[in-house]
Amino acid sequence: MQVGWRIGNLFGIPLFLDSSWFIILLWATYVNSQYYQQEWGSFLAWGAGFVIAILLFCSVVFHELGHSLVAISQGIKVNSITLFLFGGVALIEGDHRTPGEAFQVAIAGPLVSLVLFFLLGLTSLLFPTSSLIGESINRVAEINLILGIFNIIPGLALDGGQVLKAVVWKITGSRFTGIR
């Protein structure tokens, strides 16, 4: 999915923004701003909403980097990471040699999200719970928990589907049994 604007490289992997990303950025900013509207007023609420939306997408990039760096460690080429309307996607070239390798690449993204949840949750404890910074960090932590858990759902478009496919491959010895 190499469409949109190239905004940089991470570990030699080109990072792209699809034009649809701006739609979800606006939506995520709005939703998160409403969360703080009554307590902090419009200006701070919208500012916090925007920062949280950007941090959400940084989290998605870290999630995709998890997949990508594990794939690279296995000798698999990663062509790009693209952020778009539904999140992000790492364009990984080629097939895994073993079900274990496929499992590792698939589980890496959700594990990164869960580690971010844990680290951000701990970081939020350093700030008063009623502070804008503390609540914003906690909100991004919660989003990472949701991202990690959601992606483990065993549907083939999700990481959990890829995990299940790798497990079925391991059990049956057939790479394709898990997708029929």
Where are the model-predicted features located?
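Hydrophobic transmembrane alpha-helices and their immediate loop junctions
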Residues: 1-180
